[in-house]
Amino acid sequence: MFSEYIAANGEPGRTLRFCTWGGEEEGLWGSIAYVDEMNQDLTENLRLYVNLDMNHVDIDYENRGNSVTLFTNDADDYKHIEAIAEEYKKDNPMMAEKYKINLGLYDGPRGAPNGMPCNSDHCPFVYNLDGGNTIGRAAVCYGSGSLEYHTYLDDISRLNEESLGISATIYGNYMKFLAYNPEQ
């Protein structure tokens, strides 16, 4: 999606950086270490961290849940994500009927019921910038996932590929918007 858009529209005004944390559960290089090492650059330049962690619906969505939840800690980001999600629903009525798309704004202080949860890789990007003096902006998607997540039964067989497209499309379009509109 991005390469085709860049080819047609030129270089964006912002840099998009993609990070994966596949070994973090084994104590390997992860988001906390990355933020520690890149803290000054991230404090000065990070506009939004998008976390797609377990952002799918279980393959047995009829019995195990059919929802994805997209949430952020910034009201302006929420407004844009909400508008893109509504467009997605209009453009993809079968997907919108099949899967429940929830939205949330968690802009309260850390640990508060309305605060951004600190339970995944987005946490250090939100709360560890500039020694904790700068609150970073994040957008996260959680799916209803699978009961086997983080157990010895956690494998690709529970993955519902189709449901990955919801968050990838909504957040991908928002990232594209931010990349080409650096004043936002």
Where in the sequence are the language-model features?
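Extended, hydrophobic alpha-helical segments in both membrane/secreted and soluble proteins
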Residues: M1-I6, R14-G22, G30-S31
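Short, well-ordered alpha-helical packing segments
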Residues: S3, I32-D36, G172
